[in-house]
Amino acid sequence: MARYDLVDRLNTTFRQMELALATFVAELEQHRLLIARVFSLPEVKKEDEHNPLEQIEVKQHLGTEAESLALRHFRHLFIQQQSENRSSKAAVRLPGVICYQVDDNTRPLLEEHVKRINELKMAFEHIVTVESGLPTAARFEWVHRHLPGLITLNAYRTLTVINDPATLRFGWANKHIIKNLRRDDVLAQLEKSLKSPRSVYPWTREEWQAKLEREYQDIASLPQEAKLKIKRPVKVQPIARVWYKGDQKQVQHACPTPLIALINTDNGAGVPDIGELLNYDAANVQHRYKPQAQPLRLIIPRLHLYVAD
């Protein structure tokens, strides 16, 4: 019964999110568009989801075309809404900003609507990732059994509202996920895998078992106090740097989806200055500051697991 209730809440929360998004988009369309600039990125094809991105060619869209793409993007939740060649495992990204004229009465209404949408998105994600009690690999099948074709990352992704920005500049951010581990924690993880033998493409079951045993021995041979860490690169992300003249401060936002800028003309706010997003080229990335890295030796490549020398 509890599992049935969870599925019911999964579906109910998602339908509420869909309705809230549709209503919000209709509300935005009633407001005057001041300026819009979004940047479409090449689609990620099936089988290319995990390939490193060395170059990204950006296409710019302005005005009502940009607005149309942005509003459609907010409601892009299913693979049926995209090319059949595009991967369903990679979320669609559309950095940029759409700016609308608001006043003292309409701004709080729009902000409240976005707050409600984001609450539903976070509740939906919590149902899938926490309340389901399922491991990561099993969640995909569970969600798609009840919501076939759902792009879960698009469903999780919240909307970002900004108020009266003076300037917006776009760029790219390179990051790593870093997690420190103890030797015994890694051994426990490998031991768990050894006790549930399976085949992992392109290895047979026996080959995979032998590979795990070698990895186990490699870790077991390390001193107990060895410093281990997972250092996994995250795909380059579009970001927006927003300058607020009144507060004299800059705020950086992740920008996988268009920012929604509300311009309150009652307060004398004007149309912001919006920069462009340049093509990404990994070979020409310049770091403002790159600290001296700790010497690390890769010990289990598939886990991005390193040991400090």
Swiss-Prot record:
Q: In the UniProt record, does the keyword Zinc occur? A: no
Which biological processes are named by the entry's GO terms?
DNA replication termination
Q: Which GO terms describe its cellular component?
A: cytoplasm
The main location is: cytoplasm
Location in or out of the cell:
Cytoplasm
| GO molecular function per UniProt | DNA binding
The alphabetical list of record keywords is: Cytoplasm, DNA replication, DNA-binding
Top-level taxonomic group = Bacteria
Question: What task does this protein carry out?
Answer: Trans-acting protein required for termination of DNA replication. Binds to DNA replication terminator sequences (terA to terF) to prevent the passage of replication forks. The termination efficiency will be affected by the affinity of this protein for the terminator sequence.
What does the similarity note say?
Belongs to the Tus family.
What is the name listed in the Swiss-Prot or TrEMBL entry for this protein?
DNA replication terminus site-binding protein
